[in-house]
Amino acid sequence: MLAGRGARAGGGLPRGWTALCLLSLLPFGFTNTETVITPTTVPTSTEIMSAVSENTSKREAITLTPSGTTTLYSVSQDSSGTTATISETTVHVTSTSEITLTPGTMNSSVQSQTSLAITVSFTPTNFSTSSVTLEPSLLPGNGSDPPYNSTSLVTSPTEYYTSLSPTPSRNDTPSTIKGEIKCSGVKEVKLNQGICLELNETSSCEDFKKDNEEKLTQVLCEKEPAEAGAGVCSLLLAQSEVRPHCLLLVLANKTELFSKLQLLRKHQSDLKKLGIRDFTEQDVGSHQSYSRKTLIALVTSGILLAVLGTTGYFLMNRRSWSPTGERLGEDPYYTENGGGQGYSSGPGVSPEAQGKASVNRGPQENGTGQATSRNGHSARQHMVADTEL
């Protein structure tokens, strides 16, 4: 019998321990909190509702409008459903980037259930954003007291940085000047104003343009800020035919010449880098050379003109000539006798001979160059006969 009782006592012991363990596992206060989150997407509005549904006397609903205004409605009602107080609180926010719901615990035998409905619509914006945190907490209380549910709205601003590149003003906009160099022959240039650019070594206009066009236009096309603007700056260069080291910068007038000289003096260091050692104001016509054929033709023409002029001068200083090569108007008799000085009234001459000489002198002085004839004979023959006599 004792053995049978001991066997029964041994069989019932595990049941007692099991019951004792079950009793020890039961807590004095039972709390069960269940959170249900139901996401719903509506493209036109944003709503956040939080409600505590079982054995609670206070429920809150939070609504976020898309325009950036958050409205909190606090509704207090008793267990029978009668509304006691309605209060409204408005908080302005720009947008919602984060929503956190943190339920707390309460040492009570009342079981509460919280449901949250979230409606989110995405709208791109370039403004500053803020982070909104909703923290509903259940404070501990007695089992007989209604549970107190509080929701705190915490807004933490988030800085939004936007890097904007500065927009340049109209005055700060750099001027765009396109420069170009044109090469021409010095004989084809019709202008007279020019500046001779002395190069360190002999170079043609095309070679100089190929190597230094951009840099030279930057120096000579510089303008004041008030005159700056989009345009084209054209420079005309001509190769000198007299001086191989000289490139002529041809200019239109004195005003442009004075302006370019100032720029060249201002940028002398830059000119040396371009191979220009010096610059002087010179006339374009002085750098034109004539060809050898042209020079020969000019010299020949000058010599012929000189010969013709000399010949004409000597001809103008002499009278007309006779066929025998003697000057007309002079009698050979006068030439032989000293121009008519041989007639004298010497003591050995008879008066008849003097009369004949005076008679013969008249025809010789008549200006015809020949004496009058008598009986078909010239006066010269009679004079010879008289002289012989």
Curated annotation (Swiss-Prot):
<keyword id="KW-0472">Membrane</keyword>
<dbReference type="InterPro" id="IPR008083">
    <property type="entry name" value="CD34"/>
</dbReference>
<dbReference type="GO" id="GO:0048471">
    <property type="term" value="C:perinuclear region of cytoplasm"/>
</dbReference>
<dbReference type="Pfam" id="PF06365">
    <property type="entry name" value="CD34_antigen"/>
</dbReference>
<dbReference type="GO" id="GO:0005764">
    <property type="term" value="C:lysosome"/>
</dbReference>
<dbReference type="GO" id="GO:0003094">
    <property type="term" value="P:glomerular filtration"/>
</dbReference>
<dbReference type="GO" id="GO:0045766">
    <property type="term" value="P:positive regulation of angiogenesis"/>
</dbReference>
<dbReference type="GO" id="GO:0009897">
    <property type="term" value="C:external side of plasma membrane"/>
</dbReference>
<feature type="modified residue" description="Phosphotyrosine">
    <location>
        <position position="333"/>
    </location>
</feature>
<feature type="transmembrane region" description="Helical">
    <location>
        <begin position="295"/>
        <end position="315"/>
    </location>
</feature>
<dbReference type="InterPro" id="IPR013836">
    <property type="entry name" value="CD34/Podocalyxin"/>
</dbReference>
<keyword id="KW-0130">Cell adhesion</keyword>
<feature type="modified residue" description="Phosphotyrosine">
    <location>
        <position position="343"/>
    </location>
</feature>
<feature type="topological domain" description="Cytoplasmic">
    <location>
        <begin position="316"/>
        <end position="389"/>
    </location>
</feature>
<keyword id="KW-0732">Signal</keyword>
<feature type="glycosylation site" description="N-linked (GlcNAc...) asparagine">
    <location>
        <position position="149"/>
    </location>
</feature>
<keyword id="KW-1133">Transmembrane helix</keyword>
<feature type="glycosylation site" description="N-linked (GlcNAc...) asparagine">
    <location>
        <position position="126"/>
    </location>
</feature>
<dbReference type="GO" id="GO:2001214">
    <property type="term" value="P:positive regulation of vasculogenesis"/>
</dbReference>
<feature type="modified residue" description="Phosphoserine">
    <location>
        <position position="350"/>
    </location>
</feature>
<dbReference type="GO" id="GO:0045171">
    <property type="term" value="C:intercellular bridge"/>
</dbReference>
<dbReference type="GO" id="GO:0007160">
    <property type="term" value="P:cell-matrix adhesion"/>
</dbReference>
<keyword id="KW-0325">Glycoprotein</keyword>
<feature type="glycosylation site" description="N-linked (GlcNAc...) asparagine">
    <location>
        <position position="55"/>
    </location>
</feature>
<dbReference type="GO" id="GO:0098609">
    <property type="term" value="P:cell-cell adhesion"/>
</dbReference>
<feature type="glycosylation site" description="N-linked (GlcNAc...) asparagine">
    <location>
        <position position="200"/>
    </location>
</feature>
<comment type="function">
    <text>Possible adhesion molecule with a role in early hematopoiesis by mediating the attachment of stem cells to the bone marrow extracellular matrix or directly to stromal cells. Could act as a scaffold for the attachment of lineage specific glycans, allowing stem cells to bind to lectins expressed by stromal cells or other marrow components. Presents carbohydrate ligands to selectins.</text>
</comment>
<feature type="compositionally biased region" description="Polar residues">
    <location>
        <begin position="361"/>
        <end position="378"/>
    </location>
</feature>
<feature type="signal peptide">
    <location>
        <begin position="1"/>
        <end position="33"/>
    </location>
</feature>
<keyword id="KW-0597">Phosphoprotein</keyword>
<dbReference type="GO" id="GO:0001894">
    <property type="term" value="P:tissue homeostasis"/>
</dbReference>
<dbReference type="GO" id="GO:0035759">
    <property type="term" value="P:mesangial cell-matrix adhesion"/>
</dbReference>
<feature type="glycosylation site" description="N-linked (GlcNAc...) asparagine">
    <location>
        <position position="107"/>
    </location>
</feature>
<dbReference type="GO" id="GO:0042482">
    <property type="term" value="P:positive regulation of odontogenesis"/>
</dbReference>
<protein>
    <recommendedName>
        <fullName>Hematopoietic progenitor cell antigen CD34</fullName>
    </recommendedName>
</protein>
<dbReference type="GO" id="GO:0050900">
    <property type="term" value="P:leukocyte migration"/>
</dbReference>
<dbReference type="GO" id="GO:0009925">
    <property type="term" value="C:basal plasma membrane"/>
</dbReference>
<dbReference type="GO" id="GO:0016324">
    <property type="term" value="C:apical plasma membrane"/>
</dbReference>
<feature type="glycosylation site" description="N-linked (GlcNAc...) asparagine">
    <location>
        <position position="253"/>
    </location>
</feature>
<keyword id="KW-0812">Transmembrane</keyword>
<dbReference type="GO" id="GO:0030246">
    <property type="term" value="F:carbohydrate binding"/>
</dbReference>
<feature type="region of interest" description="Disordered">
    <location>
        <begin position="325"/>
        <end position="389"/>
    </location>
</feature>
